[in-house]
């Protein structure tokens, strides 16, 4: 029975999500699932699957259009992003000596596609929450839900990451006391994580040294010396 469920889960993830899900958001869903009611959890999972399928279709259509536009491009002088600024950023690397004229053009197109994809993923989170204005927490959601965007975790405000992870948990599934201390990755500075920290701001939990286990001292009770009794 376990093998069958495992196979179905793997097929669903492969077919609905083009990228691997970030462990941070996966942990939140797992913890929520443990305390959720069966009916509420099933509805939440179905809704998430529909959102993932819709996003996968949008991403596929997006990249198909991008490839077609690249093949049809003939004007390499006009760009959405300033080439001078891109070239200045490239020169910030001390190891870079010379930059060809074509390199900033390629970077400009790559940055444009990166912004478009991140916006598409962020807008999906906006519609998921039935809003019409894209907010910074939507960008945080796109970052935490996409494995290839892990390098952006450090520049996204922690409050937005925390709200995104807690917002993915169905209401009434986690007690208030547990929600206040979850997830481990967003504890204030100087606070030691409780239990297994998992992922902490995109870094493995090993960034915090585990507290060593201190066993209880075993004291041997020595019997008081008794004077020898003369027979």
From Swiss-Prot:
Which cellular component, as a GO term, is one annotated location? nucleus
Q: In which tissues is it expressed?
A: Ubiquitous. Present in etiolated seedlings.
- Gene3D superfamilies tied to this protein: Histone, subunit A
**One Pfam family for this entry, by name?**
Histone
User: What is one Gene Ontology biological process annotated in the Swiss-Prot or TrEMBL record?
Assistant: abscisic acid-activated signaling pathway
Compartment list: Nucleus
Output the SUPFAM superfamilies linked to this UniProt entry.
Answer: Histone-fold
Give GO terms: molecular function aspect only: DNA-binding transcription factor activity; protein heterodimerization activity; sequence-specific DNA binding; transcription cis-regulatory region binding
Region listing for Disordered, in residue ranges: 211-231
Q: Which UniProt keywords apply?
A: Activator, DNA-binding, Nucleus, Transcription, Transcription regulation
Query: Where does this chain mainly localize?
Result: nucleus
The family assignment reads: Belongs to the NFYC/HAP5 subunit family.
> Oligomeric state and partners?
Heterotrimeric transcription factor composed of three components, NF-YA, NF-YB and NF-YC. Interacts with NFYA2, NFYB2, CO and RGA. Interacts with REF6 (via N-terminus).
Its annotated function is as follows: Stimulates the transcription of various genes by recognizing and binding to a CCAAT motif in promoters. Interacts with REF6 to directly regulate SOC1 transcription in response to flowering signals from photoperiod and gibberellic acid pathways.
Name-wise, this protein is Nuclear transcription factor Y subunit C-9
Source taxonomy lineage? Eukaryota, Viridiplantae, Streptophyta, Embryophyta, Tracheophyta
């Amino acid at each position: 029975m376990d093998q069958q469920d495992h196979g179905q889960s793997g097929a669903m993830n492969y077919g609905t999500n083009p990228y691997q899900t970030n462990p941070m958001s996966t942990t939140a869903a797992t913890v929520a699932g443990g305390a959720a009611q069966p009916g509420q959890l099933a509805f939440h999972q179905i809704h998430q699957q529909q959102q993932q399928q819709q996003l996968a279709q949008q991403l596929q259509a997006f990249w198909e259009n991008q490839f077609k536009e690249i093949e049809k491009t003939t004007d390499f002088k006009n760009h959405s992003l300033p080439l001078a600024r891109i070239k200045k950023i490239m020169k910030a690397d001390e190891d870079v000596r010379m930059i060809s004229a074509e390199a900033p053009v390629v970077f400009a197109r790559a940055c444009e596609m990166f912004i478009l994809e991140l916006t598409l993923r962020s807008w999906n989170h906006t519609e998921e929450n039935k809003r019409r204005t894209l907010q910074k927490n939507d960008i945080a959601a796109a970052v935490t839900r996409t494995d290839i965007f892990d390098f952006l975790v450090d520049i996204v405000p922690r409050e937005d990451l925390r709200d995104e992870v807690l917002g993915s948990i169905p209401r009434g599934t986690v007690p208030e006391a547990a929600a206040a201390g979850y997830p481990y990755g967003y504890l204030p500075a100087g606070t030691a994580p409780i239990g297994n920290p998992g992922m902490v701001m995109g870094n493995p939990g090993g960034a915090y040294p585990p507290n060593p286990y201190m066993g209880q001292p075993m004291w041997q009770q020595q019997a008081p010396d008794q004077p020898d009794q003369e027979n």
